[in-house]
Each structure stands twice: as C-alpha cells, then as structure tokens.
C-alpha cells in the first residue's frame, strides 16, 4: 500500500470537504477541478463521478498502480500537465475512501508551494470519505458516506 513520504512539509494542511459541498462548488466554479486518483480497475468496475453539471472535465490520474499499489512516479507532472495553472483556484482530490487522495493532494500542494509564481494561489482539498466511503459494520462500502452514498451523479462502465 502507498504510504506517506518522509519528505512531506510539516506546515501544509490539507482541508477536507464533504462530497455534496464539492459537487456544489464544481457546479458553479469554473476555476475548480475534481481529480480522481483511484486506479483504472476502480474507475471501470466501481464507477466514477459524473460531470453532469460540473464546469470542468474530471481529471483521471492514478496515484498508485494496481495491483502492487506502487506510487505513480509521474503523478504530479501528469496532473500539472492537464491543468492551466493560471485558471485554477481549487483542486479537489478523490479516491475510494479519502486516504490516497489526501496524500495526492498533499503531494501536489507541496509541489505548487515550491513554485513562487503560483504559491498560495491554488488550494488542494481532499474529498472527505471519497467515492465509496467508510467501511460499514459488515465490511462494505457505500452504505454510510461518500460520493455515491450522497446521491451525487456517477457512472459505471
């Protein structure tokens, strides 16, 4: 499983936002983007957020590669190459439960903060509970919180 890096800056705090708040923001703000950091099998078999009323396309970029869950060494570069940084204010990161996306948001925020021309102009935010949410008492996801549980638009291929 992907672990946090020892070289993370200690002074960066990643805020969290509930899925319904994130969707509302993405529906009205053209400077906000949703970045889904799950794996290709998760997108294909579990589903993915649907951009029905969102102002921008969803960015799909694997934080780690299935099945070994090794970190994508090009993750940050792939994300930044898909964005016009002059037009971004908020980047929302989502994964299955909110864990990987937190590390992904932290990693991108750290990189952005190192670039003086955009430092403190773009905020990386974690989608609390992720796409599927926490495990229920019977060890199943999607029954207590998360994007799908909140009734937000999603698709499955």
Named regions from a protein language model:
Residues 1-33, 40-90, 101-157:
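Rhodanese-like catalytic fold shared by cysteine-dependent sulfurtransferases
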Residues 98:
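Conserved G/P- and acidic residue-centered "switch" motifs that form tight phosphate/ATP-binding loops
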Residues 94:
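Short, surface-exposed ligand- or partner-binding patches at beta-edge/loop junctions that are enriched
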């Amino acid at each position: 499983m992907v672990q946090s890096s020892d070289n993370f800056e200690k002074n960066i705090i990643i805020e969290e936002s509930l899925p319904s708040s994130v969707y509302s923001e993405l529906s009205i703000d053209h400077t906000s983007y949703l970045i889904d950091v799950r794996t290709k099998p998760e997108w294909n078999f579990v589903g993915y957020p649907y951009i029905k009323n969102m102002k921008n396309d969803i960015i799909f970029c694997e934080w780690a590669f299935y099945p070994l869950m090794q970190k994508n060494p090009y993750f940050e570069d792939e994300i930044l190459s898909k964005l016009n940084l002059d037009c971004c204010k908020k980047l929302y990161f989502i994964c299955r439960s909110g864990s990987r996306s937190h590390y992904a948001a932290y990693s991108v925020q750290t990189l952005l903060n190192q670039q003086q021309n955009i430092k403190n102009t773009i905020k990386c935010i974690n989608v609390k509970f992720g796409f599927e949410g926490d495990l229920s008492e019977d060890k199943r996801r999607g029954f207590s919180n998360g994007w799908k549980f909140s009734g937000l638009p999603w698709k499955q291929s």
